[in-house]
């Protein structure tokens, strides 16, 4: 569940989430290694924080393209709270930094962050920026500050232990108007640092506690939004994908008389297509 709202006479907006269940679901569906769980988990958490600020027909996608072991991460959210994502490759050997923590910067390497906003019009808006960190939260912060010119503070975290995902969560704070006094900004920055790492804070506190710690009585309004890892794939869409094959390829499948498996990249669900279904597709192509 995401909690969002406004503070400081609507000069500041915020969104916070305990995304543990979301990240656990993604990790299980894709059968990820620890460091890929952390990478995808952070991006999923970051995109989930944006759900309250999406319009009805909006689809928001974050894409990270890396140059090292982690090549590609994608996360997508819609206004209805449905979030999905995937990472390539799914299994990567753990890389740690001098503090013994997951080193996403090294695992991802140099690369780009693309923010894709599909407003339901003909062409989505795509904004690419270079990764400045690879730790994801810092890269999203840089994007909002530079590309959207909204001063932002973002914390994202995924805590892993021997049993898997222990805790995941995130928070974003955005200053919507430059008339907010400097002393208030300084106070927000100070309080924000006190609740990070966000996963450590959420181990003993709730997302509401994080908001109260930062804003106190300055909070003016809060709302809640359900968040679920839910894909829009279906058996019918799997059939549609086979229609892209050439006639000769479809004939070859029919000759083998085997069930065809089509996997969704977003959620790793596998759909089994029967030979007679492939025959129907071929018949339609030959009409």
From Swiss-Prot:
**Pfam families from the UniProt entry:** HSP33 (PF01430)
Disulfide pairings:
231-233, 264-267
In its UniProt record, which GO terms are filed under biological process? protein refolding
Q: Which InterPro entries match?
A: Heat_shock_Hsp33, Heat_shock_Hsp33_C, Heat_shock_Hsp33_N
Q: Which of UniProt's keywords are assigned here?
A: Chaperone, Cytoplasm, Disulfide bond, Redox-active center, Zinc
Any keyword Signal? no
Question: In which family does this protein belong, per the annotation?
Answer: Belongs to the HSP33 family.
Q: What is the purpose of this protein? A: Redox regulated molecular chaperone. Protects both thermally unfolding and oxidatively damaged proteins from irreversible aggregation. Plays an important role in the bacterial defense system toward oxidative stress.
What is the recorded name of this protein? 33 kDa chaperonin
């Amino acid at each position: 569940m995401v909690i969002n709202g406004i503070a400081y006479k609507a000069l500041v907006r915020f969104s916070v989430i305990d995304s543990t269940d979301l990240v656990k679901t993604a990790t299980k569906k894709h059968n990820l290694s620890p460091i890929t769980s952390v990478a995808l988990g952070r991006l999923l958490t970051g995109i989930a924080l944006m759900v309250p600020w999406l319009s009805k027909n909006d689809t928001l996608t974050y894409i990270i393209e890396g140059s090292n072991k982690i090549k590609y991460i994608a996360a997508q959210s819609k206004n209805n709270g449905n979030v999905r994502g995937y990472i390539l490759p799914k299994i990567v050997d753990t890389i740690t930094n001098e503090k013994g923590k997951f080193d996403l910067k090294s695992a991802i390497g140099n690369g780009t962050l693309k923010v894709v906003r599909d407003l339901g019009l003909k062409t989505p808006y795509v904004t690419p920026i270079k990764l400045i960190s690879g730790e994801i939260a810092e890269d999203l912060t840089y994007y909002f500050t530079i590309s959207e010119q909204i001063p932002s503070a973002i914390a994202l975290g995924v805590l892993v232990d021997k049993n898997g995902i222990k805790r995941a969560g995130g928070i974003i704070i955005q200053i919507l108007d430059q008339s907010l006094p400097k002393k208030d900004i300084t106070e927000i920055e100070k309080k924000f640092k006190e609740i990070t790492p966000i996963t450590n804070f959420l181990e003993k506190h709730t997302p509401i506690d994080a908001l109260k710690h930062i804003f106190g009585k300055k909070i003016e309004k809060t709302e809640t939004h359900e968040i679920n890892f839910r894909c829009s794939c279906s058996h019918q869409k799997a059939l549609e994908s086979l229609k892209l094959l050439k006639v000769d390829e479809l004939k070859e499948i029919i000759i083998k008389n085997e069930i065809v498996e089509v996997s969704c990249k977003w959620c790793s669900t596998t759909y089994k297509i029967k030979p007679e279904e492939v025959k129907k597709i071929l018949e339609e192509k030959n009409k």
